[in-house]
Amino acid sequence: MALKTFNPITPSQRQLVIVDRSALYKGKPVKALTEGLTKSGGRNNLGRITARFIGGGHKRTYRLIDFKRRKFDVEGTVERIEYDPNRTAFIALVNYADGEKAYILAPQRLAAGDKVIASEKAVDVKPGNTMPLQFIPVGSIIHNVEMKPGKGGQIARSAGGYAQLVGRDQGMAILRLNSGEQRLVHGSCLASIGAVSNPDHANINDGKAGRTVWRGKRPHNRGVVMNPVDHPHGGGEGRTSGGRHPVTPWGKPTKGKRTRSNKSTDKMIMRSRHQRKK
């Protein structure tokens, strides 16, 4: 997929850069593989705002994506590649030999007519094929990686994302993630071959604020431009720096304050993503 620019007949089109989706399927999704999606506007069951700056946006239908890929040793044929408004990656509709249909994350270089298969044994190292990490060749580029066997893929699922299998150790696979983190994952966890589709997503430019509103994101206001009743940084005569270390609207330290508690799974992280920055 290429990027698309426009002849600037309006100011917002001057900066606009979007992904050219002309090669994608133009019809509606398979109804049996969709669910309704209700917007919350950032409100909880009491009607109170729990996530600020969310609301509006185009109505969406949720596509049910098969992240688990547990339909073993049944070959599937890719019918088409589709757009999905709920994620940055494209999705692929797969027709299995037994008549079942499913949506999967579309990796790069997967096209209509291609064959894909998932197995608990070693299979061909081709984009879209899924197998346990213990059978994937070291050095392979992978996506949709499970963190617990049977839980479904959690790592490397967004547009252009991938992880690299860099080694094995005592039944564990060593992965290098895009963030620079190296971590251990059990060898029986499934992963799909290839990098996720739509790598050009990183290069888009919305060109105007309204395009962000179409996605359901409302304008984001800084605390220093508010009144004292609305934010600890608010008030003052003229422009101020806030007068204190950065805090949230509820007075808790932010911007660099560490909030992550140590987890038992920290032992799976061999190299932190923060080490790269030093």
From Swiss-Prot:
Q: Which residues cross the membrane?
A: none
- Give the record's GO CC terms: large ribosomal subunit
Tell me which SUPFAM superfamilies the record gives. Nucleic acid-binding proteins, Translation proteins SH3-like domain
What does the record give under GO molecular function?
A: rRNA binding; structural constituent of ribosome; transferase activity
One short Pfam name that applies is: Ribosomal_L2
Q: What keywords does the record list, in alphabetical order?
A: Ribonucleoprotein, Ribosomal protein, RNA-binding, rRNA-binding
Q: Key word Chaperone present in the record? A: no
Superkingdom as given in the UniProt entry? Bacteria
- Share an example GO biological-process annotation for this protein: cytoplasmic translation
Q: Where is this region: Disordered?
A: 202-278
Q: Which SMART domains match?
A: Ribosomal_L2, Ribosomal_L2_C
HAMAP family assigned to the protein according to its UniProt record, in alphabetical order: Ribosomal_uL2_B (MF_01320_B)
Quaternary form?
Part of the 50S ribosomal subunit. Forms a bridge to the 30S subunit in the 70S ribosome.
Functional note: One of the primary rRNA binding proteins. Required for association of the 30S and 50S subunits to form the 70S ribosome, for tRNA binding and peptide bond formation. It has been suggested to have peptidyltransferase activity; this is somewhat controversial. Makes several contacts with the 16S rRNA in the 70S ribosome.
The entry sums up its family as follows: Belongs to the universal ribosomal protein uL2 family.
Q: How is this protein named in the record? A: Large ribosomal subunit protein uL2
Species this chain originates from: Rhizobium leguminosarum bv. trifolii (strain WSM2304)
